[in-house]
Amino acid sequence: MNQTLSTIEELLRIPAPCPGPMGLACDGPDLWIGSYDTCRIYGMVAMQGRVFEEATAPGRPFGLTVTGDALRVVVGDRDDGGTDDRFIRRYIMGKDFKSDAIRCPGGTGSFLAYDGDRLYLSQRDAQVILELDDAGAVLRTIPVPRQITGMVIVAGRFYLVTTESRESDDYRLLCLDARKEEPEVHELASIPFAARSLGFDGTKFWTNCRGENTIVAFAKPD
């Protein structure tokens, strides 16, 4: 953990509705959680901890984001052996996954963010965010100084959970403004656990503490 940055201000922790929570997205007062272990997604009322919807994913779910009345979900192979091609799948809330799929560029990708117009995909090892068109073609590549383990767009800026490497326990919250020709990056806070995914409900951030099967809400740094 970084000793020079202030630590995030935790507001509450709630049990995850599943083991191995990986993906997370906010939809008003509701959370959507994807489980690496069960290969299912769960809709839950955050402050009640009540699951109101769940569905089997067509693979192992990673990052997800809300796009209107649907979710976009990065899905990988269930089998840990062999190749792990990643696809972006569409889940219609209250219904099921649709058959259409967009292959992630290079077959790899982890987390998603949506700005109301375009979809963005992170690639952890490449340390980039890819802006995608509707067909999944790359419109822009945004470099990031650290590996991304969660992201969300708030007021036009990317907020990122990051780490130095897969072996590091130094997790940090970054703000990246990519609207300028040269993206501006600011480190905001240290995160004292291995966080996965990032959502924002309008007032506070949410992330998964996968190792403890909990979901953590924390204050938005000034």
Q: PLM features: what roles do these ranges have?
A:
Residues L12-P17, E54-A57, A101-G106, T141-R146, ...:
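Surface loop/turn motifs at the tips and blade-to-blade linkers of beta-strand repeat domains
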Residues R13-Y36:
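Beta-strand-rich domains and repeat architectures in extracellular enzymes and scaffolds
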Residues P19-A25, G59-T67, G106-D115, V144-A155, ...:
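Repeated scaffold domains used in trafficking and secretory/extracellular systems
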